[in-house]
Amino acid sequence: MVTSEFKLFKFMLMGMSIAVALALSGPCRAFDIKGGVSKESGPFDLFKFGFKAYKNGQKEEAVEAYRYAAEKGHTGSRWALANMYADGDGVTQDDFEAFKIYSEIAQQGVEPGSEDTGFFVNALLSLANYYKHGIAGSPVRIDLSQARQLYFQVASTFGVPEAQFQLAQMMLAGEGGNASPQQAKKWLNQARKSGHPGAMAVFGNILFDEGQTARGLALMTAALDRCKPKDCGWMEALQEQAFSVANEADRRTAVSLSHSIATGSDD
């Protein structure tokens, strides 16, 4: 499953990337020469204009500016444009178009320490999601092996909790390769230490099934305090099932432990 943690990651990335742009940009005007920005402007100026236009609800102007900046090689604009296509935000939703742009970013690569690293990582994660689910009506078919490889790259090289969680899920299910429960537990444990609610829930359920009843139930309970509404349903089902078969002593211990987990005093 693709959780809202991924969308939050995209939102945070955009916020960090445009901090300088916001500081340097003035009021947004129409995309013309009088506004000081045209298609001949530099890629960073076009990116700044595109972001300001987007923020002001002028999404057609934002798309136009991002396109011109992307044609000039601006990675952040490519990424923003891909997200708009993926979400149907200001343009007709087109996952295949988003896939193609994310692929361009991934193929371009990044130098160590590059300011474009976040865009590159996000593109890899987006591509992994597309390969995992495929894109109907397009040449992009489900390729679980490729999805697993991309999740592994992002999880191991960049330590992104969402990638660690998705990789672990595939390892547990034996998707895209051999099942590897022990490796899956390792990745889930890393992701849950970063506060990923899905990883907390799944890792907790595994511990519960292995006999660590109170600790497993505590992690599943703590996950419910962190999950986004759209992701809470399956976590609630896991927690309620475990809670229903746990004895009273384990329930009480789990509640106490869940508070420690929530405050970060339990690792």
UniProtKB/Swiss-Prot annotation:
Single biological process term from Gene Ontology: polysaccharide biosynthetic process
InterPro entries cross-referenced by the UniProt entry: EPS_Regulator (IPR053479), Sel1-like (IPR006597), Sel1_AlgK (IPR050767), TPR-like_helical_dom_sf (IPR011990)
ATP-binding as UniProt keyword: no
Alphabetical keyword list: Exopolysaccharide synthesis, Signal
SUPFAM superfamilies: HCP-like (SSF81901)
Signal peptide: 1-23
The protein's role, per its UniProt record: Negatively modulates exopolysaccharide (EPS) biosynthesis.
The name this protein goes by in its record: Exopolysaccharide production negative regulator
Organism lineage: Bacteria, Pseudomonadati, Pseudomonadota, Alphaproteobacteria, Hyphomicrobiales
